[in-house]
A protein has these predicted regions:
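Cytosolic-facing regulatory segments adjacent to core modules
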Residues: 1-54, 68, 166-167, 178
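Alpha-helical context
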Residues: 6, 17-21, 61, 108, ...
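Generic marker of residues within folded, mature protein domains
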Residues: 20, 143-145, 158
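Active-site donor-binding loop signature of nucleotide-sugar glycosyltransferases
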Residues: 33, 157, 170
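P-loop NTPase motor core
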Residues: 33-152, 174-176, 182-201
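Well-ordered beta-strand positions in beta-sheet-rich domains
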Residues: 152, 165-169
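Conserved GTP-binding G-domain of TRAFAC-class P-loop NTPases and closely related GTPase folds
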Residues: 152-158
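Basic/aromatic-rich interaction segments and small domains that mediate binding to polyanionic partners
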Residues: 162
Length: 201
């Protein structure tokens, strides 16, 4: 946001310098292009992996920005994208991490932790994914939450493992280590026990 405002303070320059230092020497490649089709993504990823066999992860940000050429129903077209990325991962033997938006239904529930059914056009995405991870921060909905500064990574699907929640400290856009038990107690505080009531005989 500071970059877009073009107003850099000394602290901003220090943060930028630190960030560049973290990225320097790391094998991270970005393709900043719009309206890429699934076929173009597959070709780009495969060509890159041939040139750089050490490639360990492909990230798509985000799924519904991929250009759809099919004239089929939109949900079916999204299914084609999902299956295509699955094929890419298997063919290249490289994990593909695809970000996806949520439907607005989550906003209408008391418990706003996202579920698999909240994924837009979720049927095919949920079926094809090996792992689904949902991010949640209680302070977004409850500013006075005891879990302020804590992010939940909820594993809602794990084809070859267990489901559960991993907690991270969320600071300045970064996920940092945190004591899991402490974070859990703040994120899901135990209900106070109510005194027992006895009926008169």
């Amino acid at each position: 946001r500071v970059l877009f405002r073009s107003k850099f303070e000394d602290e901003d320059w220090a943060r930028l310098s630190t960030g560049i230092g973290h990225l320097t020497g790391r094998n991270i490649w970005m393709v900043d292009a719009t309206d890429l089709t699934l076929e173009q993504i597959q070709q780009t990823a495969t060509s890159h992996q041939i040139a750089h066999p050490e490639t360990a992860l492909v990230v798509i940000d985000y799924l519904l920005l991929i250009k759809i050429q099919s004239t089929a129903r939109y949900d079916l077209a999204v299914g084609e994208l999902s299956k295509g990325l699955k094929r890419l991962a298997k063919t290249n033997r490289t994990p593909v991490l695809a970000l996806s938006q949520l439907s607005r239904g989550v906003e209408s529930r008391p418990n706003k932790r996202p579920m698999n059914s909240d994924l837009k056009n979720s049927g095919e995405i949920e079926a094809d994914a090996d792992i689904i991870m949902m991010l949640y921060r209680d302070e977004v909905y409850n500013p006075e939450s005891p879990a302020k500064g804590i992010a939940e990574i909820n594993i809602t699907k794990q084809r070859n493992g267990v489901l559960g929640t991993v907690y991270r400290r969320f600071y300045n856009g970064h996920f940092l280590p945190i004591d899991q038990e402490e974070a859990k107690s703040k994120s899901a505080p135990q209900q106070k026990s109510q005194p027992r009531r006895y009926a008169k005989a």
